[in-house]
Amino acid sequence: MNPGPIAPARDATPARDATPARDATPARDATPARDATPARRAASARDATGPPRVPCPHCEGRFSRRGLNRHITVRHPEVRSVPQPSPAPQPLELRLQAAMREARVFSIVPKATRSLVAVALTDVLRDVHTNNDVPSWEALLAFARVVLQMPDKGDTSRSLPAVIRGNLAAFRAGARLEYRLRRHFPRGPRPPPTDTGQRAARIASQKLSEGDISGAARALCSTDSATDSAEALNALRAKHPPAPPDYSFPARPPQVDIAPTSTDEVLAAVSSFPPSSSAGPDGLRPRHLRDLLSPALGAVATALAKALAKVVDCMRAGTVPSALRPILFGARLIALKKKDGSIRPIACSSTIRRLAAKIAWVNERDAVVTLLGPTQLGCGQASGTEIAAHAARAFIHAHPDAALVKLDFRNAFNTVRRDLVLREVAEHVPGLFPLVDLAYRCPSHLIMDNAVISSECGVQQGDPLGPALFCLALRPLAVSLQSRLRLWYMDDGTLAGDPATVASDVQRVLDYEGRSGLALNPTKCEIFSLDAQPDLQRSLPGCRLTQRLSLELVGSPLTDEAIRPLLDRCLERTAVMLDRLPLLSAHQGLFLLRSCFSAARMQHLLRTCPAGTEASALHEYDDLVLEALTTILNLQLPPEAASQASLPVRFGGLGILSVRRLADVCYAASLTAVADMVATVLPPEALAHFSASQEAALDQTGVRARVPPDKQSKQRAWSDALHQELRDSLLASAPHVADQARLRAVDRPSAGAWLHALPSSSLGTALDDRSLRFCVGLRLGAPVVAAHSCERCGDPVATNGHHGLSCERSAGRHPRHTMLNDTLVRALHSAGIPCTREPQGLDTSDGRRPDGLTLIPFHRGLHLVWDGTVVDTLAPSYVNHCATIPGYAVARAERAKLRKYAALQATHLFSPLAFETLGGHGPLTANFLEGVYHRLIRATGDKRAGSFLLQRLSLAVQRGNAIAFLGTLSSSPPPPHNP
């Protein structure tokens, strides 16, 4: 590369070269005497231990990556104006790798640009469908990396929509993967995190803001992210062996009829992705497609869905250019750590490829599940783990002398022979063959930041079709086995029965290894038998001999002796996870505790074994969760409040369910739900034992008579009977009228809507820690403040703080009223109904105007007028009636509003907007909101739009309550948070 002439006036000046400069110069590097000085040696030592240095291409200096660009600008300005020769084009996988490393992509599409981006993507997809050549597919792979590329850090000169419009103009002008990459320098390896807990909490908070609840829980629990090290790279290479030389792929089946993909199938498949699902090498995330397919875009979204359907049809028909196969069916490779320290490779392929695979799987799922039969429980089978656990447990108890073997294949998904997979697909599921043939006949590229690995064997872990393809490859082995109990959950097999028969089946598995590419991992295989079985041990040298105390299957104990050790391990792991919850905000911590870390975390264990026999361990678990709850909320919970917190939200609690109370009903409900499937895999004598266990479990619940027989397979029917019993007990033992009124108010419909809101600061649905503490304390009747005098009126304030809600000078009244109306106005505008606040000309006799008026007719040609109010359920004037009549206060407030605005009802459609401080609303308000819900759903296409509006209204009430509480403590409360 020719650097061009160097201007003597700028770089050859002795005075400038002799002056210690911030940037290194050739003169400094070229002076031998200076290199020999102690200072120079110390600087060299610092360079050796500090950040990596990059050589300047125009001089002999070395600089940090951040400083090199500045050095070139200052010392070599003439280089910028000299035309540089175009470099030789790199392979597509290397260009994608560079774009992955250097081009950050927006996680969402800003609303202001969604229509433009959707039109551009539709044009690209139509070009792919029409031409189906390499340039059109390359444009599709480059689309997100160019159009949705984020600006440089610190670049605030343009708004985000302006950035995307500029990127879109560059893309239309021909910019592809190299767009803006030359201004960046590759980042080095990421250092390992110094605080795993803080990093996990940060990732969990981000995923929760994106709506991925399960992803947030996994991130908070996870310690399994592998660093970008040479050891991890070598382990990943070892996980992807080369193709065997004797591959023999089948021919394409004749007359493969594939039904055209509909737009409804496209929309359903896009909606099925997790909210924070990652992008593949091309940078296009499922969230991007969800934004661009929003019904709010109308015909633009419909055109995009049709174009996506056409491209999906191309892929399902197998007509993608062969040169694009390794890229389109490659993936971004992620390394995760297993519990034993080994590496688990996860392939995140392009969203378009995953979309086609999801649609193909939906069309062929029933045929595949029927073909695999009842013994393969890991593919498309509902409650597969529960079926396996119950069946194995019943067999072990019915046949105490039988032998049981658990089989585990080493690196199974990445080593199964692809020709075997394709033969099984061609023979049994020909509708999948064109797509599977595209994906797995040829090697594909697995792209990392610092390497590209060739995938030549197995199926990708991350491919929506991967589990089905692996199970199809394992099917010939599964149908050949003769043991009395044969269960498979993906690559984990369980054989039980006569020792000789089981030993013979193990030999069949070993014989199948050569034909399938699979290999058993003896160190993870287990043998359970009361007597030593030499034949089995000789077949599996190095396998473990398992005792009754540690016999488990799919995470469930198979013997009564194994229940307590497994519960103890669960307690240890849960304690570590609960310690991380306080690292989040209180609202996020409470949300995850209820959704993922209380009874939800124990759900599988409670449903697959009689854990109720270990009451002490379950009590210990409940105490652990209660301690985490009080830590998160910074709130003391008396026994009655703790009991109420263990109720579901719809029963007036917080949803922190007690595992001790639910253990028996969970087990009984699971046994009833899987009874029909268990009958297909168990021999008669074991099935009789299963039926006897089911009857005993149903009687053990104590509420069998209260659950109808047709609902005994539903866990909710069992748990509701228990929760209703506890709620009635709390109500009967409530010592004060205010407590009775509170308990009746909090279990009304919609009273707990705010607890279901996703706590996201970006959405404006997160409560700050103090507000959450007051709101939960009000709901549970727990003390939230010390007894004091109100700063506003001087009246005494009890420890429950209720005075702030009914104080004549309540600080929360006006902010709460404003937030309620702002929320409703935004909802009406989103539904396409413009409106105005406090309309003129509609004054009442007292000179006050209603809160709002729609500017277009709302129903039957009438304009809607509304006026809002929030009444205190526990106010002295209402509390006695509210203790016996739920909703008395809000119904009375609605009637008062109707009387006040009776004159308007002849010319307008009037509706009150009345809420209680404890969250419930009146019947007229419910009718009004129902009409808004339907219009919102039609306008947005989101069936959850109505519940989202109710959650925001409920949050507005709770924020006002918190301000009222704080107002008793200070004469100048903080301003309300108005999202």
Give the location of each predicted region.
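A conserved non-catalytic segment of reverse transcriptases
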Residues: 422, 455, 507, 511-608, ...
